[in-house]
């Protein structure tokens, strides 16, 4: 279903853009438009269906999935395809533009006006989602409303839901919906794909934050330099008014140097930037199963608190979230006060180092992290709290950077006492070949390694052999709402399968 925006007459929208109406009479000009979408399955009667060139197919090729709409917006190529292939339009007005991206932005801004809401964004390879949710949680604790654009909690029916950053129309619609709900802020994840493909439109961020950069999306960017340049674009050309940069990695240091000295920088390493007037010092310590942190501001103000999420990375991401909020003008004393009153930050992020345990069952952790760096972080965190054995379940996505699969096998084999290799989003790849590539990375004897194609069966097998002092780490899938196999998105919940496995464990069956 398309999120509804501000109703406009089609004729008024046309006048405000460079689109032209073709092959239809003026009777259509009185139609009202209240939504815009690029997702054919979600188009409704009063929507404009946007049909531009995609990565592999043109949007007009999906017209047969559109039941009814107010108009179709396409480019000259789309119009040519419609004419040559005699695609049905059901007497629907066809809008053709010579400037697809710029006209789409104008239309989206008219139907989904997003003035008067303050937007901040987070980019990087790992930590975007958790940092965004932590920032939103801190705002909520202070009584401040924040809308979010997220991959957490989406359903399989939302075709763009598992995009880190939604398509342009959906992003504007979500921000508008948050604004209508009287949100003060909106937080978004800015993926390299979204930045490259213009999915952020002409949105100017009040704060842009950079977490880190490690190898990922090499099927898209081909090399790390191209990947870095895509991320860097968010901090250039007035795309953001201020910045927060983690300089604990070489790419963070480089970004800071190349984008000017006005950014706030955060680091665990005191040798970086101590002379910088906007330097924030972070440090982390273990507190039981969770982590405490200390954050020292440029003025010397000290925040000491903790976060209930498992893993050092979440404590560091909390520090970054605090710096982001301070850059938005929120007093650090106010943030410190709510953390003290609450006894730390207590929250659950579905599929992000999420712990499941009942009675004397083994601890099961579900984590979305699928990059080499994120998987190693999860393995280290899980190993550190495990008295018994660490049993790991790993998968790798099809049609995504295959070079990391061997590294995943190497890491999981090194940290795990027992390893199950299973299938995830194989897409159009042979899942057995993906498993083999992971297995190739496992060093040493493989008697503790088992391939089980079914993720559900892998979960059950892992829980069945686990003892109460063992930990089962399900790495690489998280809370994804479906399995992407051979072009079909099959509804699936790993978290539900874990719950069922623990119920079976409790029953002794």
UniProtKB/Swiss-Prot annotation:
Q: Which UniProt keywords apply?
A: ATP-binding, Cell cycle, Cell division, Cell shape, Cell wall biogenesis/degradation, Cytoplasm, Ligase, Nucleotide-binding, Peptidoglycan synthesis
Which Pfam families does its entry note? Answer: Mur_ligase_C, Mur_ligase_M
Residues engaged in binding UDP-N-acetyl-alpha-D-muramoyl-L-alanyl-D-glutamate: 164-165, 191, 199
Give the EC number(s) under which this enzyme is classified.
Answer: 6.3.2.-
Which compartments is it annotated to reside in?
Cytoplasm
Q: Which GO terms describe its biological process?
A: cell division; cell wall organization; peptidoglycan biosynthetic process; regulation of cell shape
Q: What is known about its processing and modification?
A: Carboxylation is probably crucial for Mg(2+) binding and, consequently, for the gamma-phosphate positioning of ATP.
What Gene3D superfamilies does UniProt report for this protein, alphabetically?
Answer: Mur ligase, C-terminal domain, Mur-like, catalytic domain, MurE/MurF, N-terminal domain
Tell me the residue numbers annotated for binding ATP: 124-130
* This protein's record includes keyword Transmembrane helix: no
Which residues in this protein are found as N6-carboxylysine?
231
Involved pathway(s): Cell wall biogenesis; peptidoglycan biosynthesis
- Which GO cellular component terms are attached? cytoplasm
What GO molecular functions are on record for this protein? acid-amino acid ligase activity; ATP binding; magnesium ion binding
For this protein, the record's SUPFAM superfamilies field holds:
MurD-like peptide ligases, catalytic domain, MurD-like peptide ligases, peptide-binding domain, MurE/MurF N-terminal domain
Family matches, as InterPro entries: Mur-like_cat_sf, Mur_ligase_C, Mur_ligase_C_dom_sf, Mur_ligase_cen, MurE/MurF_N, UDP-N-AcMur-Glu-dNH2Pim_ligase
What NCBIfam families does UniProt report for this protein, alphabetically? murE (TIGR01085)
Protein purpose? Catalyzes the addition of an amino acid to the nucleotide precursor UDP-N-acetylmuramoyl-L-alanyl-D-glutamate (UMAG) in the biosynthesis of bacterial cell-wall peptidoglycan.
As for family, the record states: Belongs to the MurCDEF family. MurE subfamily.
Name the record gives this protein: UDP-N-acetylmuramyl-tripeptide synthetase
**Organism, as annotated:** Tropheryma whipplei (strain Twist) (Whipple's bacillus)
What lineage is this protein's organism placed in?
Answer: Bacteria, Bacillati, Actinomycetota, Actinomycetes, Micrococcales
**What gene, per UniProt, encodes this protein?**
murE
């Amino acid at each position: 279903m398309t999120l509804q925006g501000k109703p406009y007459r089609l004729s008024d929208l046309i006048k405000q853009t460079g689109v032209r109406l073709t092959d239809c009479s003026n009777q259509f000009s009185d139609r009202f438009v209240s939504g815009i979408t690029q997702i054919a399955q979600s188009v409704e009667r009063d929507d404009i269906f946007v049909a531009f060139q995609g990565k592999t197919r043109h949007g007009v090729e999906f017209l047969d999935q559109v039941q009814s709409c107010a108009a179709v917006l396409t480019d000259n190529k789309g119009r040519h395809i419609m004419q040559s292939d005699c695609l049905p339009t059901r007497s629907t007005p066809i809008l053709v533009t010579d400037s697809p991206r710029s006209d789409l932005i104008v239309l989206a801004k008219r139907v989904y006006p997003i003035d008067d809401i303050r937007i901040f964004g987070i980019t990087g390879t790992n930590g975007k989602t958790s940092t965004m949710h932590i920032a939103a949680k801190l705002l909520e604790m202070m009584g401040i409303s924040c809308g979010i654009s997220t991959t957490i909690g989406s359903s399989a029916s939302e075709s763009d839901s598992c995009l880190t950053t939604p398509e342009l129309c959906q992003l504007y619609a979500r921000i508008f919906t948050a604004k209508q709900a009287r949100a003060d802020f909106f937080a978004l994840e800015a993926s390299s794909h979204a930045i490259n493909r213009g999915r952020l439109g002409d949105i100017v961020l009040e704060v842009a934050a950079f977490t880190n950069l490690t190898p990922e999306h090499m099927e898209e960017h081909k090399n790390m330099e191209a990947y870095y340049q895509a991320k860097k674009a968010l901090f250039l050309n007035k795309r953001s008014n201020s910045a927060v940069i983690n300089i604990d990695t070489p790419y963070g240091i480089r970004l800071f140097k190349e984008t000017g000295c006005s950014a706030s920088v955060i680091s665990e390493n005191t040798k970086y930037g101590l002379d910088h007037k906007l330097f924030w010092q972070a440090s982390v310590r273990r507190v039981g199963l969770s982590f405490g942190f200390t954050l020292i501001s440029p003025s010397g103000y000290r925040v000491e608190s903790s976060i209930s999420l498992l893993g050092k990375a979440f404590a560091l991401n909390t520090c970054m979230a605090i710096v982001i909020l301070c850059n938005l003008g929120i007093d650090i004393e106010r943030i410190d006060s709510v953390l003290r009153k609450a006894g730390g930050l207590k929250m659950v992020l579905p599929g992000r180092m999420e712990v499941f345990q009942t009675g004397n069952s083994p601890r099961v952790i579900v984590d979305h992290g699928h990059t080499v760096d994120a998987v190693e972080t999860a393995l280290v965190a899980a190993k550190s709290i495990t008295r018994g054995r660490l049993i790991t379940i790993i998968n790798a996505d099809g049609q995504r950077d295959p070079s990391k699969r061997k590294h995943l096998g190497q890491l999981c084999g090194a940290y795990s006492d027992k390893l199950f290799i299973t299938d995830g989003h194989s897409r159009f790849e042979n899942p057995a070949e993906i498993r083999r590539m992971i297995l190739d990375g496992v060093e040493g004897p493989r008697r503790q390694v088992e391939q089980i194609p079914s993720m559900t069966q892998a979960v059950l097998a892992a829980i069945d052999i686990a003892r109460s002092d063992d930990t089962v780490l399900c790495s690489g899938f998280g809370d994804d709402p479906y399995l992407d196999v051979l072009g079909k998105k099959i509804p699936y919940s790993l978290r539900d399968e874990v719950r069922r496995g623990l119920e079976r464990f409790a029953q002794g069956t």
